[in-house]
Amino acid sequence: MKKQEKNTALELEAFVKEKGVQFGKFVSGWLTPKRLFWFLLVVYLLSLVPLLWIGFYNYPSADDYSIGSDCRQAFVNTHSLLVTVWTGIVRAADDWLNWMGYFTSNFLMALPPNTFGERAYVWTSVIMIGALSLSTAYLLKVIFCRVFHADKYLAGSVILLMLFITVQRMQGRVEAFYWYSGAANYILVHSFCMWFYGLLISAIYDTGKKRTGKLVGASVLGFLVGGGNQMTALNGAVVLLAVILCVSLQKKWRTYRAFWWPIGLYYLGFLLNVAAPGNWVRAADATGMNPVKAIFVSFYYAFDYCINEWSGWPVLFLVLILIPLFYNMAGKTDFSFPCPLGVIAFGFCLVAAMMTPPLFAVGSMEAQRLQALTYTVYILVVTLSTGYTAGWFRKKLDQKNQNQQFSGNTARYILFCLLFFTFASALAVIPTPHYFTFSSAITDLANGSARAYGEARKERIAIYESGERDVVVKELPAQPELLYFSDIQEDPEFWENKGMCKFYGFDSVRLQKELK
């Protein structure tokens, strides 16, 4: 009897193994890197549709009016693009002298889309999401395909997975994608930085006119990024310093002497940024930390935000699904991926360095746009660190197989990860509709708050442009999660009210709240 039971168990085990192997072969034959890439591309693009759709109800607020007022008046009075741009340059120079040193950001904020009409503001989300997606994709494609000779479909899959987690779990979404002044200062300048890195790395593998063109582009971008928000500017300065040290230790400066120009112009922009007279004017009203304390506290904040707040199950999913993809990608490079712990530590230092400037300047990381930028860099660092570690592990095993197709086990694992993510996402969205950016957009579109907000803002514009000198507007009926940043107050002397007066040219504006 026992022998019969044992034979039955062995037969069942053999049957399960056989079916498992057959299923693995079926999945590996169906789930190829190419099909995975196209599937992820469709998913990512579809996930952006609600984000762009809700952008049709987006309207400017706060600094979009106060900082953008000079360019608005220039355009209304002259209808000249050149005069308007020149006015933005003059405004940036004035802010550099009297308020803040990031001259690139000053110019971008001085020229918001609503300069050319309120409805031009709908392009804000398109610009920010598009710039972030395209610049990140360009940089990572250069790293994966040109440096490490990875399969383009595997590289594309990694990029899309990273972008999905970055965009759909973004912190401070309204200030990252929908409020122009905040997004231009941080996300747009960060995107310039990604293009700068990508052009520099790509130029290494080019010759002749191609290299020259990319170095010229990198030089322009380097100067602009160095003059951008000080979080991105400092981060880039640290990365370039590490590059300079590596090249110096290898004594290869003769080989890369042409790269002095973009690097030098980057540091020129950075020095003009941090040494601006306006920084001292603003610092007089700020309560920041001393530099040493800011550095130490930034490491604590990096642990606190990255581990306690941002590293939920979506980030864990990202790491787990990237491991086999990077493992396959590492088969086509001879690079040995030395010292992975050192690379991970350097990545963590970069995330911490993002937090040092605001801690030094204002003593906190509370502004959502600061968290949005730091989160974006954090996910990038997690992705690259995962890839580097997976490559190191593969080289340790010394596997020479360069077949880029998925094995049965790998295909089953990837399929399981995708199904798990779908199931977990449904469980997360049901009780928390704003969990993902796309679910937040769908929620506000479906419940009508986005439409109500947009119609109320449209009615206000008609009042603003009616020619009245003392304007009174009603309270907004809704505050959509992705669209609402701030509003004018009942006090006509409030700074946002004054900025709107300057933008439209009337004497006063105030909010009239409904009696409850």
Pin down the residues of each PLM region:
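Short, Lys/Arg-rich, polar N-terminal cytosolic tail immediately upstream
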Residues: 1-30
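Intrinsically disordered, polar/acidic, low-complexity terminal segments
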Residues: 15, 24-95, 99, 113-156, ...
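Transmembrane catalytic cores of multi-pass membrane glycosyltransferases
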Residues: 52-122, 180, 226-370
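Membrane-interface micro-motifs in multi-pass membrane enzymes
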Residues: 63, 152-201, 229, 353-387
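Individual alpha-helical transmembrane segments in multi-pass integral membrane proteins
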Residues: 118-134, 183-191, 226-227, 233
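Transmembrane alpha-helical segments
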Residues: 132-144, 192-204, 238-246, 319-326, ...
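Short hydrophobic alpha-helices at membrane interfaces in multi-pass membrane enzymes
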Residues: 202-224
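Membrane-interfacial entry segments at the cytosolic side of transmembrane helices
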Residues: 210-214, 250-264, 335-342, 400-421
